[in-house]
């Protein structure tokens, strides 16, 4: 007999978040692992996508005793279809990707022509600016109250486990699609050009590659993936609040990429599942092992210590990550010289 409460808990607290963070990790891996672009504002793109997705799936709420209200566009879809939430979910996800991609484009255009550290500074600033802008845009985002009661595309009433499992499966299907597309792209000549830029941009320039445009493409696509994942995350939590998108989130995503294996699309998915399970385990450890109230708060610090120890162990024993990037060497080196 399957424990439905366990299915509900695993789907909501581990599997679905792991799939969502895997999408973010794939986006960051495209930027950093394949192209060498340092993005310190992952949480900013993620938060922008979360709010765009939330706005498209919720009705507008005016100011009142419960808060300043927020913008909502889901009612617009009632004119065309009875499936307003599903359409809002799809349109909101696409809009989240578009807006996050445009923000990434605006940041990348002036900074990618400069030294790499300017991009890091600009994206770091984005993370702070995005959160403060969300917090102070009361009529649109709900301010510090955020956007509440965000619906899911699939609801099964009293069968909570069905609702949670269906959403986890939805996120899993999206991850498979994103992985397939990125895997194909990074194995194509376009992806090999990105790796050439990562290894030696001057050499790529000498071979006639438009390195600026290639870096721009990689950064914008990565930012768009982060925004789309943010929309999924808001629907998972059913709420979007500014405090969910702090620099700690950026650090977590970077840890997933490093632990899994930077430059390996499969590896970063493994890293996302590993780090998300570590968080899930520490959240549930107190109940599983009947720990005393002494661990109520301290268990969260134990998680940070565990992540730190994991990173140190990887640096010492597996610096390339759990699933390292494969290094391919041609079996016919004479091809490079035009002779047999």
List where the protein language model places each region.
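Transmembrane alpha-helices and adjacent helix-loop boundaries
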Residues: 1-340
């Amino acid at each position: 007999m399957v424990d439905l409460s366990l299915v509900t808990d695993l789907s909501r607290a581990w599997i679905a978040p792991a799939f969502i963070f895997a999408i973010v990790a794939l986006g960051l891996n495209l930027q950093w692992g394949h192209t060498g672009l340092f993005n310190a504002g992952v949480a900013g793109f993620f938060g922008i996508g979360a709010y765009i997705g939330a706005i498209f799936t919720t009705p507008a709420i005016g100011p009142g005793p419960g808060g300043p209200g927020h913008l909502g566009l889901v009612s617009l879809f009632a004119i065309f279809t009875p499936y307003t939430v599903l359409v809002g979910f799809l349109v909101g996800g696409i809009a989240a990707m578009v807006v996050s991609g445009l923000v990434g484009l605006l940041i990348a255009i002036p900074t990618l022509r400069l030294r790499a550290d300017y991009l890091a500074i600009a994206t770091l600033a984005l993370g702070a600016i995005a959160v403060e802008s969300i917090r102070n845009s009361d009529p649109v985002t709900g301010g510090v109250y955020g956007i509440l009661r965000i619906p899911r595309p699939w609801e099964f009433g009293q069968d909570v486990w069905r609702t949670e499992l269906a959403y986890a499966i939805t996120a899993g299907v999206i991850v498979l699609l994103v992985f397939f597309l990125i895997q194909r792209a990074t194995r194509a000549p376009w992806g090999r050009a990105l790796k050439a830029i990562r290894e030696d941009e001057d050499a790529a320039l000498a071979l006639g590659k438009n390195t600026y445009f290639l870096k721009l493409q990689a950064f914008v696509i990565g930012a768009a993936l982060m925004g789309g994942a943010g929309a999924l995350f808001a629907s998972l939590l059913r709420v979007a609040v500014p405090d969910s998108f702090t620099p700690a989130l950026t650090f977590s995503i970077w840890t997933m990429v490093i632990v899994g294996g930077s430059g390996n699309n499969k590896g970063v998915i493994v890293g996302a599942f590993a780090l998300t399970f570590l968080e899930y385990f520490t959240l549930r450890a107190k109940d599983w092992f009947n720990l005393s109230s002494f661990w109520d708060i301290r268990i969260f610090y134990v998680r940070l210590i565990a992540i730190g120890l994991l990173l140190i162990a990887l640096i010492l024993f597996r610096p390339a990550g759990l699933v390292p990037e494969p290094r391919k060497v041609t079996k016919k080196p004479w091809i490079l010289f035009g002779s047999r």
